[in-house]
Amino acid sequence: MISSIDHLIIAVKDINEAEENYRKIFGMEPVWKGEHKALGTANVIFNFKNTYCELLSANGDGLGAALVNGAIEEQGDGLVGVVYGTNNIEESFSTLKKFGYLVKEPIPRVVCRGEQ
């Protein structure tokens, strides 16, 4: 069902400080810096051979900002999401739904490695 870990999401209070710290830890520059304006978040992405790490901070109002702020309030900076890849989205959706997980209808997309 799950074929890969697409990426990890780490909630951070200060995106600039976190970027500098993770730059030192990973020994590389980020490949992307941006915003999800509708979600109220800013992000920085570090790319690896088979996955990527997304630093995510609140910078406005929205569902993403609420997630980040809630996670930081509860646990401090840290892991808030593991995004999985699958070779069969319909099968994965059906299996997760069968086991009682609340899941949205699948939205196929092309990931950073050019796969769908």
What do the PLM-derived regions correspond to, one by one?
Residues 1-33, 39:
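Short, extreme N-terminal leader segments that mark the start of a protein/domain
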Residues 4-13, 44-49, 54, 67-116:
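Vicinal oxygen chelate
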Residues 20, 56, 65, 92-94:
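Short acidic, gly/pro-rich beta-turn/loop elements at beta-sheet edges
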Residues 29-71, 115-116:
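Conserved short beta-strand elements that form part of the metal-binding/catalytic scaffold
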Residues 58, 85-87, 108:
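Beta-hairpin (beta-strand-turn-beta-strand) motif
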